[in-house]
Design a protein with these regions (language model features):
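Right-handed parallel beta-helix
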Residues: 153-156, 160-229, 233
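Beta-solenoid repeat scaffold
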Residues: 60-63, 99-100, 110-142
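Short glycine/acidic-rich loop motifs that flank beta-strands on beta-rich extracellular proteins
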Residues: 111-114, 135, 173-179, 197-204, ...
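Right-handed parallel beta-helix/beta-solenoid
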Residues: 29-87
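Consensus "Asn ladder" position of solenoid repeat domains
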Residues: 167, 191, 196, 214, ...
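Right-handed parallel beta-helix/beta-spiral solenoid domain characteristic of secreted/periplasmic
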Residues: 122-173, 312-313
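All-beta strand scaffolds that present successive hydrophobic residues in beta-strands
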Residues: 102, 124-127, 162-165, 186-189, ...
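Short, T/G/N/S-enriched strand-turn elements that build extracellular solenoid repeat scaffolds
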Residues: 87-94, 108-119, 154, 178, ...
Length: 374
């Protein structure tokens, strides 16, 4: 009997630095092959390891398998030969240092999922990172009562030291969010966020996730919203046709590096007291602006000591800071001078330490001044 197909797991984390050979399972459609990997070969997998969860080197990694087509939550043990039917069940039994491997299919209420899916520390949900989760779809949402933002409808709730890798996330419910991060810092890599009616990802509170190598396409509001005092690292993602690609508000200060943002309404919206840092991004063909700053928002687009190296092409305006009361440091970018509005410091000499800070009495539970499409 053919076993359900799971993507090969060469990319799963390996315990390194032990001076020993390591054994991992390479999973294929019909068989499991044991392969011993030398320390030299382990080094060749460093790129894959960067997308893997932290491991406790003293304990073995556990694998759980899920198939919405042939799995069974009532009788299965989560092995490759006897997979669970739902991610919900796999998360119930998962302990730290567990990877939950998903077979292609749609994971929804119809297949037995209970939303939101609540990630756990030290646990990874992995589909197929090589295709950014094509054909492995988490579809649906449920109510989460956010301490900072009231009731929200979300597909996945993040957790510290958790990972979501190689899946497609879609929340078609009204005001639906794909992944919600409430003062948590998971790693989200090589996923696709599409057709979420509000945002692909929302980070609030003191979240500091790594969001890398994902694709955001045709979301109703924003690709990513960054609120509160969040400081996510947003690297090497693609945002296209997705409202505002990145919406930054309150006192958030994300690092936004080497992303491509095209065909959105606005690529990066900066409002309230937000202080994002943008380096090495390509921002092109956005309908209104490449970067918009309003109120006290102050994006750092480059200083004399740290050039921005952002490329702006064919936007309505490359930088629109006309409604911001801040000087915008913007040294070392490629753009058209007559597509810049507001007080822009092209020499990059602005002293960011002397810029406006929010009043001490201001709370962080406000709602963004502008929401795309809302």
């Amino acid at each position: 009997v053919a076993l359900p197909h799971f993507a090969a797991i060469k990319s799963l984390p390996l315990a390194t630095g032990l001076g020993l050979s390591l054994t991992i399972g390479l999973l294929h459609a019909s068989k499991t092959i044991a392969q011993t990997i030398s320390n030299q070969e382990v080094a060749q997998l460093s790129a894959a390891q960067s997308a893997a969860p932290p491991m406790d080197s003293a304990s073995a990694q556990h694998l759980l398998f899920v198939s919405p087509m042939v799995g069974n939550d009532a009788t299965a043990d989560g092995s490759q030969r006897s997979p669970f039917r739902t991610i919900t069940q796999a998360l119930r039994v998962a302990q730290p240092n567990t990877v939950i491997l998903l077979t292609p299919g749609t994971y929804s209420v119809d297949s037995g999922e209970v939303f939101p899916l609540i990630l756990k520390p030290g646990v990874t949900i992995q589909g197929d990172p090589s295709t950014q989760g094509r054909g492995i779809v988490l579809r649906g949402g449920g109510t989460f009562l956010s301490p900072t933002s009231a009731g929200q409808n979300i597909t996945v709730l993040g957790a510290d030291q958790s990972q979501l890798v190689g899946v497609t996330v879609t929340n078609p419910n009204p005001r639906g969010y794909g992944v919600w991060l409430e003062s948590s810092s998971p790693t989200l890599t090589n996923n696709t966020f599409t057709h979420n009616t509000h945002d692909g990802i929302s980070t609030v509170g003191n979240s500091a996730p790594l969001i890398r190598g994902n694709r955001f396409n045709q979301n109703g509001g924003n690709g990513i919203t960054v609120f509160g005092q969040s400081r996510p690292e947003i690297r090497e993602n693609v945002f296209e046709q997705t409202g505002f690609a990145i919406n930054v508000a309150e006192q958030a200060a994300p690092l936004i590096v080497n992303n491509r943002m095209s065909q959105n309404k606005i690529a990066v919206l900066v409002q309230e007291y937000a202080r994002p840092v943008l380096r090495g991004n390509t921002i092109e063909n956005n309908q209104q602006d490449g970067v918009t700053a309003i109120a006290h928002g102050q994006p750092d687009l480059g200083t004399a000591g740290d050039p921005g190296n952002n490329i702006f092409r064919d936007n309505g305006l490359d930088l629109n800071a006309d409604a911001s009361d801040q000087v915008i440091p913007a040294f070392g970018n490629q753009w058209i001078a007559d597509r810049l509005e507001g007080e822009v410091d092209l020499a990059g000499t602005t002293n960011l330490a002397q810029t406006v800070s929010p009043p001490a009495t201001q709370t962080l539970q406000t709602v963004a001044v502008i929401q795309s499409g809302r």
